[in-house]
A protein has these predicted regions:
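Short, hydrophobic alpha-helical membrane anchors of single-pass surface/secreted proteins
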Residues: 548-564, 570
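C-terminal low-complexity, Ser/Thr- and acidic/Pro-rich disordered "stalk" regions positioned immediately N-terminal
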Residues: 524-549, 580-581
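Substrate-recognition/cap regions that form aromatic- and gly/pro-loop-enriched pockets
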Residues: 330-459
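A contiguous strand-loop segment
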Residues: 26-146, 167-308
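Bacterial N-terminal signal peptides that target proteins for export
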Residues: 1-9
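Hydrophobic core
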Residues: 13-21
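C-terminal membrane-anchoring or membrane-association module
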Residues: 564-581
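Histidine-centered catalytic/metal-binding microenvironments
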Residues: 438-531
Length: 581
């Protein structure tokens, strides 16, 4: 029984260390259409998975969820926390980029981002942590709305971006939130940015088209006009809860400041480094300092003529402090070495990225197309961004491989493996792989612009009729690009074999520094545990030997006494016999 209890305790301790995935190291951007080279709205996110021993090694699948009819009582259920919400009688088709394990009961769906057939797009979520005082006043709800279910809640239902935000607000009012989160929802007319601030508080704004934003895992909204119902959607008690929590903060003009009231007192280094890097990359002359108390959400470039392209935002997601020479990505620190935190920082293009994506929303594309997603699975630093329309009704087979370990037939695992080889052998590959993708992307951008022109004059009905054609073209393009990816992977393996020998590590298990540190620590802990067990066993053995010696001594003592007793008995008897004789 005791052994069983020990085993159960160990199992429970191990289980407690396995996190339900919340993408707590994500970062995102938005660029309004007045600031882009082609007049499109741009937004995107890098989904990070920083959980050792599988940091940066977490398969994502790009899929189409068909339209579906439901009967009364059918529920959307989040297996990550028990959240449930009624399905509509009919729900729309949409795309999503799921965790490969979705639906198996282990961790939730985490659809991440997608388009629906009404032309609505979203990315969800950038996690954020509310202030402790706020959580005392308005706690998170264990089975409330969480990241894992967000895409599956919004995209099947929302016919406009505003509807998507209003739906989330309604659910938060009714069910509460399980997490602090930030989401972005767009259609071809407008884009909304929403901060989920606590168990039941939230603020969303219609994003101004003459601004850009860079945001990581914390809150950024300053003062907003709650009376402006056209451009702001907010919970009714957002100010009252801050006051109740005794954490009501104002800006220099005395106006309620949302982020200062609901967010932590200080940014974490990971949030500070990525936000600062993103803003200064977009605008090298931005009037900010690394150690500013907070960074504003909305920015205008210092140069009024500055316009941003797709390549600019790809570069933002790949950035590894190339423009900030005083900093070095912390995933380059050798395991076991001390980290100089003044030099080594967490980069936007870091080792934990599992899914990068950029959404390009063009006003002149028909609504059913939604726009274009530029999909960059695995680490953004060494993955290609590949374009797909939102209207597709199927995705290429390698996007749907659901293996948990390296699989050569998987798009995710192929590009992941390429990145791992680059990082393991920088002397062999340097920046050559990223440069190769950049060159190919130039061609894809031109091809995509021509396709956009081809479809831009269609009515919505005409656009819907092209879905099969567009899907067929997308599948062919994906097949061609995947062959290029596999060719690059094969050439890299050949180079490693030639330069490093047949016994070289081909990195099929990955090369994530955080994982290596965790593995080294686990090995160290296991060694200590083995030593402890050996010491305990030795101690127990000594104790048993001592006990045995004591027992033997006792037995010998008894025998000795018995011997003396018998001797005395015979001596006395002999004496008696002598006297009798």
């Amino acid at each position: 029984m005791r052994k069983l209890l020990v085993k159960l305790m160990i199992a429970l301790m191990a289980f407690a260390l396995i996190p339900v995935q919340v993408a707590q190291a994500c970062s995102a951007f938005i660029v309004g259409k007045e600031l882009t080279t082609d007049g499109s709205m741009l937004f995107g996110r890098t989904e990070d998975y920083p959980y050792a021993p599988d940091g940066g090694r977490h398969n994502k699948t790009y899929e189409v969820v068909p339209a579906k009819d439901y009967k009364d009582g059918d529920m959307l259920e989040d297996e990550s926390n028990g959240f449930a919400y009624p399905h509509l009688s009919h729900e729309m088709k949409y795309t999503a980029t799921y965790d490969a394990a979705h639906g198996d009961g282990s961790n939730g769906n985490f659809g991440a981002h997608g388009f629906n057939e009404a032309g609505v797009s979203m990315t969800s979520t950038v996690s954020a942590t509310p202030h402790d005082k706020i959580l005392e006043a308005d706690p998170l709800v264990k089975n409330g709305l969480a990241e894992a279910a967000m895409v599956d809640l919004v995209l099947p239902r929302a016919k406009t971006a505003r509807e998507g935000i209003e739906l989330v607000a309604k659910v938060l009012d009714e069910k509460g939130s399980a997490e602090g989160n930030i989401i972005v929802v767009a259609d071809k007319d407008e884009l909304w940015y929403m901060e989920i601030l606590s168990g039941h508080q939230y603020v969303a704004i219609k994003f101004p088209q003459d601004r850009y934003a860079i945001f990581a895992n914390t809150y950024y909204l300053g003062h907003v006009d709650f009376k402006d119902k056209e451009n702001v959607i907010a919970s009714k008690d957002v100010e009252a809860v801050a006051k109740k929590a005794d954490h009501y903060k104002t800006d220099k003009d005395g106006n309620f400041h949302i982020a200062d009231s609901y967010g932590p007192d200080e940014y974490t280094e990971r949030n500070r480094s990525r936000t600062y890097a993103g803003i200064t990359l977009m605008d090298p002359k931005a009037d900010i300092k690394y150690d500013d108390k907070h960074f504003d959400l909305l920015h205008k470039p210092t140069d009024p003529s500055k316009k941003y392209s797709l390549e600019d935002v790809f570069a933002e997601q790949r950035n590894r402090f190339e423009h900030l020479k005083q900093y070095t990505p912390d995933d380059l620190v050798e395991p076991g070495k001390e980290v100089d935190t003044n030099k080594y920082k967490y980069a936007l293009g870091n080792e934990n990225v599992i899914n990068a994506h950029v959404y390009q929303i063009k006003k002149d594309l028909p609504t059913p197309f939604g726009g274009v997603v530029w999909l960059g699975l695995a680490q953004s630093r060494n993955t290609p961004y590949v374009p797909f329309y939102g209207i597709v009704n199927d995705t290429y087979a390698p996007f749907k491989v659901r293996s948990a370990k390296y699989d050569p037939t998987s798009w995710y695992w192929a590009v992941w493996h390429i990145d791992q080889m680059v990082m393991k052998y920088p002397d062999l590959f340097g920046n050559s792989i990223q440069e190769k993708w950049k060159e190919l992307e130039k061609g894809w951008i031109k091809e995509q612009a021509a396709l956009d022109q081809k479809y831009s004059g269609l009515t919505d009905d005409q656009a819907k009729a092209t879905a099969d054609e567009v899907t067929s073209d997308s599948l062919k393009r994906a097949e061609t690009i995947f062959k290029q990816i596999k060719q690059v992977e094969s050439e890299m393996e050949d180079k490693i074999r030639t330069e490093k020998g047949l016994e070289a590590d081909f990195v099929y298990d990955g090369y994530n520094k955080a994982n290596l540190v965790a593995a080294a620590q686990a090995k160290k802990d296991a060694s200590k545990e083995t030593e402890k067990k050996e010491e305990t066993a030795s101690s127990q053995s000594s104790s048993k030997a001592s006990d045995s010696n004591s027992s033997l001594s006792a037995v010998l003592g008894v025998l000795a006494l018995a011997g003396f007793g018998l001797a005395g008995f015979y001596f006395k008897k002999s004496k008696k016999n002598e006297n009798e004789e």
